[in-house]
Amino acid sequence: MKNAYYIGLMSGTSMDGVDAVLVDFSGAQPQLIASHTEAIPSHLLKGLQRLCSPSTDEINRLGRLDRNVGELFALAVNNLLTKCAIAKEEVIAIGSHGQTVRHMPNLEVGFTLQIGDPNTIATETGIDVIADFRRKDIALGGQGAPLVPAFHQQTFAEVGKKRIILNIGGIANITYLPGNSDQVLGFDTGPGNTLVDAWIQQVKSEPFDRDGAWAASGKTDQDLLTQLLSHPYFSLAYPKSTGRELFNQAWLEQQLSPFNHLDEEDIQSTLLDLTCHSIARDMIKLSNEGELYVCGGGAFNGQLMQRLAALLPGYTLNTTSALGVDPKWAEGIAFAWLAMRNHLGLPANLPAVTGASREAVLGGRFSAK
């Protein structure tokens, strides 16, 4: 059977690098051929972080960063192909998520904005690019997120098995696969790694809390946890999605101001519990028991996994590697899949998940010619 190669590009709210994956979709299940992470240079990272907070001269900065991120994504593709020695002519298309700089679907005129110019990626790689996956769903009245549940359904659903796929990046999202004819559901539960990363970066200048070791050295403050969990987002009904617009460093500092007597490691422990409790609450609303499979950066945080297991005694807990998909690359593979769906003219959103009025083919194609 002829190979069906697609490349997926993903940079999430954590902004911890650009993940590039080469995937073969010619078989029954996606096959990961090669993977590569391109580090985000510090000057570009600072520019992106500034752009995520409203300020002046935004349009000029947006235009520059759009090109810069496109160049970085193209570099990730070219390095990926060098690594696996596959010619660009063999790749059908690149699916690029881009870098989200605003996600505000709940305004009167909702919108989402990802940058990373697909024209730049196409011209610098010589491969057609499919990008701008979220805005069609928003145009149809949806949240534009999460988009991965359709991929999870096709890849992980099994009749008779009640499964939840939990993706923990900067933001955490879940996909509920009921194992029967009931609707697949999915939504963002709230912060994933974004607040624990922000706190350790602020206090220790470390990029992330490796294996949750710093959180494990602290003790959760129940009063602070209760206050954090009182954020209105946690009581919203789905479909719902969120991002740095709600859960960011400024919000965190505001929440911490009455708690400046707490030790720094106790705050870290509490922030990790915020992630775990908000996930567990939403999961228990869907079902008290089932199979839980975790992907994304959070899957490699032993302390996070341990706390989740304690909060969810009715669930068996594993990573998506048990289902044949490496948890580190799952989201990149999903965007390669979204590119394939666009190329084949097939819908890729789930209206029950996003709230869109109908299914739709997502993304636009940007030719390399």
From Swiss-Prot:
Entry EC number(s): 2.7.1.170
EC primary class: transferase
Pathway(s) where this gene product acts: Amino-sugar metabolism; 1,6-anhydro-N-acetylmuramate degradation; Cell wall biogenesis; peptidoglycan recycling
Biological process (GO), any one: amino sugar metabolic process
InterPro entries: Anhydro_N_Ac-Mur_kinase (IPR005338), ATPase_NBD (IPR043129)
Keywords: ATP-binding, Carbohydrate metabolism, Kinase, Nucleotide-binding, Transferase
SUPFAM superfamilies attached to this UniProt entry: Actin-like ATPase domain
Binding-site residues, ATP: 12-19
Pfam families: AnmK (PF03702)
Domain of life: Bacteria
Reactions catalysed, as given in the entry: 1,6-anhydro-N-acetyl-beta-muramate + ATP + H2O = N-acetyl-D-muramate 6-phosphate + ADP + H(+)
GO terms, molecular function: ATP binding; kinase activity; phosphotransferase activity, alcohol group as acceptor
Function: Catalyzes the specific phosphorylation of 1,6-anhydro-N-acetylmuramic acid (anhMurNAc) with the simultaneous cleavage of the 1,6-anhydro ring, generating MurNAc-6-P. Is required for the utilization of anhMurNAc either imported from the medium or derived from its own cell wall murein, and thus plays a role in cell wall recycling.
Name assigned to this protein: Anhydro-N-acetylmuramic acid kinase
